[in-house]
Amino acid sequence: ETFAKNLSNQGTRVLWGRCYEFEHLLPYQPIAEALGPSLAGLTTEAIGQLPQWVISELERFIPDVLAGQPKSDGKPSANTDQEQMRFFAGVSHYLSMLSDSNRVLLVLEDLHWAAESTLELLHYLARHTPTSNSPLLIVGSYRPESLERQHPLMAFQRQLQGVGMALPFQLLPLSDVAVEQFLYEMSGRDKAIIPLTRRLNRETEGNPFFLVEIIKALFEMNTITLKEGAWQGDFDRISRGELPLPASIKEVIQARVHRMGETTQDALRTAAILGREFDFDLLVATWTQNEDITLDALDEMLRYQVIDEGTGISNRDYAFRHHKIQEVIHSMIPRQRRQYIHAQVAIAMEKHFSPQDETVSELAHHYLQAQNLDRSLAGKAAHYLLQAGNLAAKQFANVDAVTYYNRGLTVVPDTDQAGRYALLSAREHVYYAQGNRDAQQDDLVALWELVQDMTTEEQAEV
């Protein structure tokens, strides 16, 4: 839009059309939408300069604009292909006439929803529209992840690129600096907006659509308001709180998921439970499908751009392209099924991969999420929370260690006296290291009372 606006300010005539998901079967709809306003703005003199056969052809898909104009006396051809070529030539002639006096930019958005007839006309215009005096630039946008493998747009693009008439351009995420600059200009604020800028950078990862939609949601919630051209709000508090996940973002992600095959969707749900980053072997082990089926599912996920290969900070095989994608897919899974998959992930991790330092917190997480399925799973969660806490304490991350121990004490089964003792004892040691004598004393008292309630066998165990 900025590109088109800049050209328009420089005198370029901008024609704008858009494809719509539920109107994709309407012939030539986006091109009709683009040409309609320019036709309506033509003077009688300008219309008079158009050949009557061109007026007749244009009236086929924009009848209201040219109603009452003289028609060509030529009889329609009995050959459908010839009629179509004559129609295409009429549209081409009109665009050529517009570009004779001025530069023309034709923008067609969301071509992944374009009907095949639209692409055929667009292909003709690109190859046959003469622009002797001023250039005609056609810009089309589409979402690659929304294209089926055999979508006609793919062949259309290859054909034009093959003859040097199309130049693909991929829009990359905004850089941190670009996001900051955008927010400074939009907000009319300077240093006050810095906390929100940093948070939105992390939350959106430079995705322009996510950025704009979250900002719109903050305004709709009156969390941010506008006064005298500048944003108003407690930006520190907003940046510390939970940002909204707008319905518009959910709908876009859900629509992308629903276009995939059922098998791929099933694998995708399991992957979302595994985490932002995941390994092929663990997906196979958890999903219980063979490697070939899993690879086919992953290929489809890659094609729809919901995941990337080997891009995560943990150097795992795959990573969701954006954490919002994983978040939305995770939320689409019913609670009971979600708990079941978490349990399957944890069991697979124990069975196929020996627990290591870097995995104990993941095992604790998965067993925590699955604990309501079976009380034994809560015991497993407490066991790995203890290990995760011990690892944190070993790395002098004492605050994290206490958090793990606290969580473990809330889920350890009442019957597991030894487990409770181990968690209390470990926490007491950390409190000692922190110099938190009151908390340490409380744990020592709790340990003494726990030992008094134990049987001889339980005392021997601890």
Predicted regions and their residues:
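A short beta-strand-to-loop transition that corresponds to the Sensor-1 phosphate-sensing loop
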Residues: 20, 140-145, 214-216
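Internal alpha-solenoid helical repeat scaffolds
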Residues: 8, 406, 410, 414-462
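P-loop NTPase Walker A phosphate-binding motif
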Residues: 1-25, 29
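Short secondary-structure boundary elements
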Residues: 173-403, 408-415
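Conserved Walker-type P-loop NTP-binding/catalytic site
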Residues: 10, 29-105, 155-165, 177-184, ...
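Sensor-1/coupling segment of RecA-like P-loop NTPase cores
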Residues: 121-170
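Conserved P-loop NTPase "ATPase switch" module shared by AAA+ and STAND
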Residues: 98-118
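Tandem amphipathic alpha-helical repeat scaffolds
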Residues: 142, 328, 365-370, 387-391, ...
